[in-house]
């Protein structure tokens, strides 16, 4: 479910997210080294993009000429010229650069979304591990109590060695599960720490954040498509491709050149100006046709991405509904109550230790399955 919700959080953050997870994501957004790199790359591309739509360099030439022999004349020529494109071309390139820069920004937001999604899923896994640890603590406490109880019963002759060994093996099994849980928890926290640039983080929540229930798939689909950074990026890229068509069409316009010229000889100096230009008869051949095809391809790519996102969203939505229905079929209160009744029945001698372990193991597994389903649902 979080995969669906995080598609919306970059544009419209969800207020219902728990503060603890919200704070974790905020810190990672500030401290993640990969995000900092992506931001620098984005800013560099934007600067480079703007730098391309400027006047060319000023051209300056100086030449000296003379005749050989006594009393010969000599002279010089100085020329400074500035070439430039037709003014409308600068406007079109500026518009295209703005679209491309917006596309670069969306690419950065896409990278940010993926990193924050990974961090958020880690937080949800840590919540699951904390819940599992809480259940294992209850189970270990019961195992410790049973070990003490059956030690007393064995000494009193009310229990045999086989019963005592069963209790000890149960405790060994629970201790192993606790160790596995602790290792998984440390790994998840270390991954979260790495994503935060190795700056300290604390996260010990055992409760999932409250989230608004999604009821209308069509409304969800429209909101995701309108706010998804991948689609927005493709939209900007499509607009930029169409703008490139206009730019290439204007490449047939002449290149202009204006300048100052000064000629001197023995007796006088003359000042003037230079006007020139070039007509691109061959350099722009087929470029308009190519750019039109690229614009069509960009539009098709956007439509294809919309279909993929819609299908993926439908799959996630159906999976979410199925997981929710399955999760609601488990009655956690009933299972915890059954554990207490089992313990009471064992203490009063109404059931054997074997019957207790068989029933208790079944209940613990059901509780754990319910936790796993909820964890998957929250994702």
Task: List where the protein language model places each region.
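Periplasmic alpha-helical coiled-coil/stalk elements that build and connect Gram-negative outer-membrane
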Residues: 2-3, 114-227, 316-323, 363, ...
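Sec-dependent N-terminal signal peptides
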Residues: 4-13
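Bacterial Sec-pathway N-terminal export signals of envelope proteins
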Residues: 17-59, 84, 92, 98, ...
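Hydrophobic/aromatic residues within transmembrane alpha-helices of membrane transport systems
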Residues: 28, 80, 126, 192, ...
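Alpha-helical structural elements of signaling/regulatory helical domains
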Residues: 30, 86-89, 114, 135, ...
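Amphipathic alpha-helical coiled-coil segments
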Residues: 35-52, 111-138, 145-147, 152, ...
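Small/polar-residue-enriched beta-strand and adjacent coil segments characteristic
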Residues: 58-111, 232, 236-244, 249-306
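Short, charged, amphipathic alpha-helical segments
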Residues: 94, 98, 161-170, 292, ...
């Amino acid at each position: 479910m979080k995969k669906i919700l995080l598609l919306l959080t970059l544009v419209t953050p969800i207020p219902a997210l728990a503060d603890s997870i919200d704070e974790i994501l905020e810190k990672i957004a500030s401290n993640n080294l990969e995000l900092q790199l992506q931001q620098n790359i984005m800013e560099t591309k934007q600067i480079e993009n703007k730098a391309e739509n400027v006047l060319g360099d000023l051209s300056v030439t100086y030449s000296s000429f003379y005749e050989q022999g006594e009393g010969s004349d000599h002279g010089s020529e100085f020329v400074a010229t500035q070439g430039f494109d037709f003014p409308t071309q600068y406007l079109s390139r500026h518009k295209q650069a703005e679209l491309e820069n917006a596309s670069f920004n969306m690419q950065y937001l896409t990278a940010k979304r993926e990193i924050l999604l990974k961090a958020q899923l880690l937080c949800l896994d840590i919540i699951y591990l904390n819940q599992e640890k809480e259940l294992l603590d209850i189970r270990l406490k019961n195992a410790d109590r049973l070990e003490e109880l059956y030690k007393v019963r064995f000494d009193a002759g009310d229990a045999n060695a086989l019963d005592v060994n069963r209790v000890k093996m149960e405790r060994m099994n629970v201790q192993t599960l606790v160790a596995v849980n602790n290792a998984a928890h440390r790994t998840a926290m270390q991954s979260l720490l790495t994503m935060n640039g190795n700056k300290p983080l604390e996260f010990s929540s055992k409760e999932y954040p409250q989230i608004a229930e999604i009821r209308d798939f069509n409304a969800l689909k429209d909101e995701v498509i309108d706010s998804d950074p991948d689609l927005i990026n493709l939209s900007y890229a499509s607009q930029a491709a169409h703008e490139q068509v206009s730019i290439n069409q204007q490449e047939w316009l002449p290149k202009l050149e204006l300048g100052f010229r000064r000629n001197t000889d023995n007796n006088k100096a003359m000042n003037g100006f230079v006007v020139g230009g070039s007509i691109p008869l061959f350099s722009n051949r087929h470029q308009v046709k190519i750019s039109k095809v690229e614009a069509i391809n960009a539009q098709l790519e956007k439509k294809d991405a919309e279909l993929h996102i819609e299908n993926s969203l439908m799959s996630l939505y159906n999976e979410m509904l199925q997981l929710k229905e399955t999760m609601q079929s488990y009655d956690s209160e009933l299972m915890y109550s059954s554990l207490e009744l089992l313990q009471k029945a064992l203490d009063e001698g109404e059931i054997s230790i074997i019957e207790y372990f068989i029933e208790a193991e079944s209940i613990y597994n059901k509780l754990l399955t319910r936790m796993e389903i909820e964890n998957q649902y929250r994702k």
